[in-house]
Amino acid sequence: MSTVISLPKINGEYRKNFKLSQLTWFKVGGISQVFYKPKDEEDLSCFLKNLQFDIQITVLGAGSNLLIRDNGIDGVTIKLGRSFNEINFVKNNHYNIISVGAGTLNYDVAKFCLQHNLGGLEFLVGIPGTIGGGIAMNAGAYGQEFKDVVYSVEALDRLGNKHIFLSKDLNFEYRQCIVNGFLIFTKTNLICYNDSKTSISQKLQKIQTVRKLTQPINQKTAGSAFRNTNNYKAWQLIDKVGLRGHSIGGAQVSNLHCNFLINNGNATASDIENLGELIRKNVFDHTGITLEWEIKIVGKKSL
């Protein structure tokens, strides 16, 4: 049974029993007990300071790399609004740096850099999602990861206090950053360099072409389902056990890239999670290797 929540007064927006499937790339998932979109960082800080401490908080980015279970999410689900989408130049004696709000789409950062002749962040065009989500999981593609370009990060803790971390403080590892306690990233400074518009454009086009040829980008999918292992790509192991194209309910392993799970139109979150767990079991039974989810799974499990 869900806990009754006493909500602080805020300047942002609350919605109760909000349908979360509309915000995820899989287009599945239940409702949020309370959905909150803060007006700005001050509003978010005030909310955190005044929300009873035992209430669960879940933060959403763009809804990629995410599976929300059918029974939904208790507590408060937070999605950063437009005030967290700003991109600005930062003065620095040693680097070219841009300040980016955590709610900004990775694609929009890549586009901004193209417009301003800034190189080094082209890989972001190949990573669906927001900057905040990318930092939280040290997202990467095409030979780069967030740890390679993050200079510093601003965040709020569970009590609404603001912290600034240098990249080294975030303990970046493969597909994760390790920090103590609950944090909501609000802004980051990213390192880039001067480059020609032609060079940047060519790199962006190459990445986008590769994505279109190798990933099911026009289907309902959340990106790579599993982390690669030390010795094998996840797709190689899935292919090895013969699960390319395999289905459970409306969920299917992509024929194009078998580390992508897709919703064929009528899948439930349970279909997708069960298909993923079947993959993990089969890979372990045949190879002794445990695949770890790269997709973040949140929400209440079915009884």
Curated annotation (Swiss-Prot):
InterPro entries: FAD-bd_PCMH, FAD-bd_PCMH-like_sf, FAD-bd_PCMH_sub1, FAD-bd_PCMH_sub2, MurB, MurB_C, MurB_C_sf, Oxid_FAD_bind_N. GO terms for cellular component: cytosol. Keywords: Cell cycle, Cell division, Cell shape, Cell wall biogenesis/degradation, Cytoplasm, FAD, Flavoprotein, NADP, Oxidoreductase, Peptidoglycan synthesis. Its cofactor is FAD. The active site is at R175, S224 (proton donor), E294. Its main location: cytoplasm. Pathway: Cell wall biogenesis; peptidoglycan biosynthesis. Pfam families: FAD_binding_4, MurB_C. GO terms for biological process: cell division; cell wall organization; peptidoglycan biosynthetic process; regulation of cell shape. It is found in: Cytoplasm. It comes from the Bacteria. It is an enzyme of class 1 (oxidoreductase). HAMAP family: MurB. Belongs to the MurB family. This is UDP-N-acetylenolpyruvoylglucosamine reductase. It comes from Orientia tsutsugamushi (strain Boryong). The gene is murB.
